[in-house]
From Swiss-Prot:
Known role: Catalyzes the formation of phosphodiester linkages between 5'-phosphoryl and 3'-hydroxyl groups in double-stranded DNA using NAD as a coenzyme and as the energy source for the reaction.
Gene3D superfamilies per record: 5' to 3' exonuclease, C-terminal subdomain, DNA ligase/mRNA capping enzyme, Helix hairpin bin, Nucleic acid-binding proteins
Pfam family, any one: DNA_ligase_OB
Protein name: DNA ligase B
InterPro entries named in the record: DNA_ligase_AS, DNA_ligase_B, DNA_ligase_CS, DNAligase_adenylation, DNAligase_N, NA-bd_OB-fold, NAD_dep_DNA_ligaseB, NAD_DNA_ligase_OB
Family as reported in the entry's similarity comment: Belongs to the NAD-dependent DNA ligase family. LigB subfamily.
Organism whose genome encodes this protein: Salmonella paratyphi B (strain ATCC BAA-1250 / SPB7)
Length: 561
């Protein structure tokens, strides 16, 4: 299928500002779009933390939050109001602030961050809900949600119902503050294959609801910080393990360079783990005294997240393609995103009817993943732009019997037919892709799909963009095509039969084909009444008849008398 480029419709120009892609919106529209997305995120955030219900996938929420920050920076707007953390409903102060963790984009960023730092350890970045555990006199005294990092909600009653969280401690941990992640316990969770499973939202939901005490049995705890704990990391891990926080020791590895971090990251991505993860955290063994911890200022640790299985992508244009059979397909052009090291800048939406049902317009944010063989796939529309400017699709009069001859309205189906006849399923013209066919047709103005047979070597050589070697190769391919058997030419003319059925018919000339009845076609493999009728319609089509006579004049095998 080829792009109906004259019908392509784009709305956004993009420019770079501080390394980020910015939409070229008028100020009024930028303010409106930012306000709408900000409000939507705030609504989702409120539902998530107050009701324990996720109205949107965790990854989608995170990516749209990042998109909002990007837009705010593009227009020089303060990003402090971005709703990426829980609403501050709780008033319980944390004994030690939650610093959060800086995100590193790639291995190069990891190398830069590690440079000059020593005694480094890597841990899986467990995906759940952050909590502070306060032990006093050997007993769990308080449990506080992360909140804004300085204060949160008192979760003590719920946390005491989670069997995996020790209720008593001894020794140095008898009076201690711990920070960690409450997670959904999994058996043999392979992150690469199973994904995030919206684990964070599920945990939040269990902690928010009042009627599900039994569900808390499925929660676990991963301690990632012991403020003012033992300075020696192995000693710290050993004491945590003895106290019942064994996962921290099991999943903490000393690392010296980015290669070791990358190796651990890949291993945890592909191995069976007892929890969902979304990357790794690298941390220094030596930490500042707890009184110096502040939200957003934890420069002794950093995260290297896994690339998302699906990416939120901005639709930059809607285009239509018309295949050789006349089928119109809608394609969304995207501001490029990276999925599994693949640059994705377009995704097939499907038919016009499906596109209309999806209600996708330029400016919308869609979720894209990779299906089998790395083909981009549209998963859902996660955010719609206020402006709904959509292109008008081409007329739907195209079908399997149109555009054997070139015309202004037939350009795309005509090109699709040329691409088809040059494919290995037809004449096998090596090196003849869409770009080559477009160049030849644009220069020499083909009358019909076989007009290229009349080109001279000089005409091909004079085609703009064709080097000498390429033009000579095309000339050879065109001459070799003349020797192809009759059945290959019939396939090039898009007879509605499979190659197996055509071979079974035994026809080796146009004259034989004209003598066949509908009953004959019905008896061929994979050819029923409907397909047999289509063969008759194809054979009797005036354009097909004219092409057969033209091929006869060119002395193509099977078409002459």
């Amino acid at each position: 299928m080829r792009l109906w480029k004259s019908m392509a419709w784009g709305i956004l120009l993009w420019h770079s500002q501080s390394g980020a892609l910015c939409p070229a919106w008028p100020p009024a529209r930028a303010a409106e779009e930012i306000a709408r997305l900000q409000q939507q995120l705030a609504d989702w955030n409120d539902i998530y933390w107050k009701q324990g219900v996720s109205a949107v996938d965790d990854s989608v929420y995170d990516q749209l939050s990042a998109r909002l920050v990007q837009w705010q920076r593009c227009v020089g707007q303060d990003v402090s109001s971005t709703p990426v953390s829980p609403p501050l409903n709780g008033t319980t102060m944390h004994p030690v602030a939650h610093t959060g963790v800086r995100k590193l984009a790639d291995r190069q960023a990891v190398e830069q961050w590690m440079r000059g730092r020593s005694e480094l350890w890597v841990q899986p970045k467990v995906d759940g809900v952050a909590v502070t555990l306060v032990y006093q006199n050997g007993k769990l005294a308080r449990a506080i949600s992360r909140g804004n990092g300085l204060q949160g909600e008192d979760w003590t009653p719920k946390i005491r119902l989670i069997p995996s969280i020790p209720q008593t401690t001894q020794g140095a941990l008898a009076n201690a503050v711990l920070q960690g992640e409450i997670f959904l316990q999994r058996e043999g969770h392979i992150q690469q294959r199973m994904g995030g499973m919206n684990a964070r939202s599920k945990v939040a939901g269990m902690l928010m609801r009042q009627d599900n005490a039994s569900a808390l049995n499925s929660l676990g705890i991963f301690i990632w910080a012991w403020p003012d704990g033992p300075a020696n990391m192995p000693e710290r891990l050993s004491q945590l393990a003895k106290a019942g926080f064994s996962l921290t020791k099991k999943y903490s590895l000393a690392v010296k360079n980015a290669s070791e971090v990358e190796r651990a990251r890949q291993s945890w991505l592909t191995s069976a783990l007892p929890f969902v993860t979304d990357g790794v955290v690298i941390r220094m063994a030596k930490e500042p005294a707890s009184q110096h911890w502040r939200p957003g200022q934890g420069d002794w640790l950093a995260a290297w997240k896994y690339p998302p299985v699906a990416q939120v992508a901005q639709v930059s244009a809607i285009q239509f393609s018309v295949g050789k059979s006349g089928k119109i397909t809608v394609v969304a052009s995207l501001v490029p995103v990276i999925l599994d090291d693949k640059r994705v800048q377009r995704v097939n939406i499907g038919s016009v009817k499906r596109w209309e049902a999806w209600d996708i317009a330029p400016g919308d944010q869609i979720l894209v993943s990779l299906a089998g063989q790395g083909i981009p796939r549209l998963d859902e529309v996660v955010w719609r732009s206020r402006e709904r400017s959509k292109p008008v699709p081409p007329d739907s009069h195209f079908n399997s019997l149109t555009c054997f001859y070139a015309s202004e309205t037939c350009q795309e189906q005509f090109i699709s037919r040329l691409v088809w006849l040059g494919s290995r399923s037809a004449l096998g013209l090596d090196g003849m892709g869409e770009a080559s066919w477009r160049a030849l047709h644009q220069t020499h103005r083909f009358e019909h799909i076989f007009s290229w047979l009349a080109l001279t070597s000089a005409q091909i050589a004079n085609t703009p963009g064709f080097a000498k070697g390429k033009s000579e190769q095309i000339w050879r391919q065109f001459n070799l095509a003349r020797r192809q058997p009759f059945t290959r030419w019939i396939m090039a003319m898009d007879i509605p039969l499979t190659q197996a059925a055509l071979q079974a018919s035994g026809d080796r000339s146009w004259e034989q084909l004209l003598m066949r009845t509908e009953q004959h076609w019905r008896q061929l493999p994979a050819t029923g009444e409907r397909r047999a009728g289509r063969v008759i319609d194809w054979r009797d089509n005036p354009q097909i008849k004219t092409l057969s006579r033209w091929l006869a004049a060119q002395h193509i095998p099977g078409f002459g008398s």
